[in-house]
């Protein structure tokens, strides 16, 4: 995982020395498409994503739920992220860059801004007409996809309904800080103190979610919402990846009946299932983080995957 500095690629891991061993995620820089007047146009936008990344996964889920596969084209990165960051080099599940012809994701960023400085991440929502990055913040891209294409043929369904927004926002805030990002804060910590600061709140949140789901089918109200969509990619990767690779090993999701049920329900959803590729995700995490797993060995297990999943999912 490197970064661009004034448009020049640098292969550099995260700096944790200046933060006491803590992993600090930088904010996304492209935040367009959120104004009230924004309307989607079929064929105008292109998504850069990948099966490994949980942030991209939530966007792939929303794209599928809204039936936008024909309206928003996609490129999918290689599982392996090495000295050049994310790539479109040939490999399993890769969909080449048909828009900018990039071999490396950083070339998409420099196509938008030759002097860009910052991390090079997915997902990216690219505007083909203006030849620029519209947005690279996953939480905002899913909001765009949720409603911006409703008047041009998207499937019905509002996953951020007005009546539930305060509750969705409340759950999202805790889940992001302690769980979605918490697994990274645990896994990329370089001091014991920083690791434990992330570790214990993570499991407090899992315990809280398990209790919250008692007698409930979904996190908010009686329907699938954005809160479930944002939680699911972390849960689906947890036992096979985060439990071992990121040292989040107090409990498994399999030890939480209600959370396991939620995973099974979404993993078996006809539109969500094709977005899951656990084999690809395992290959990425275990093979692309030499500071965490120097040998690059990919574990075979778990022996009993979560409901709706297989080791080849």
Curated annotation (Swiss-Prot):
Active-site residues, Swiss-Prot/TrEMBL: 53, 184
Keyword Chaperone: no
GO cellular component terms given for this protein: cytoplasm
GO molecular function: glutathione transferase activity; oxidoreductase activity
Enzyme class: oxidoreductase
Catalytic activity of the protein: 2-(glutathione-S-yl)-hydroquinone + glutathione = hydroquinone + glutathione disulfide
Effect on the protein of changing residue 53 to A: Loss of activity
Binding site for glutathione: 86, 119-122, 137-138
InterPro entries according to UniProt: Glutathione-S-Trfase_C-like (IPR010987), Glutathione-S-Trfase_C_sf (IPR036282), Glutathione_S-Trfase_N (IPR004045), GST_Omega-like_C (IPR047047), GST_Omega/GSH (IPR016639), Thioredoxin-like_sf (IPR036249)
Assembly and oligomerization: Homodimer.
Job of this protein: Catalyzes glutathione (GSH)-dependent reduction of glutathionyl-hydroquinones (GS-HQs) to the corresponding hydroquinones. Can act on halogenated substrates such as GS-2,6-dichloro-p-hydroquinone (GS-DiCH) and GS-trichloro-p-hydroquinone (GS-TriCH). Involved in the degradation of pentachlorophenol (PCP), a toxic pollutant.
Name of the protein in its database record: Glutathionyl-hydroquinone reductase PcpF
Gene encoding the protein: pcpF
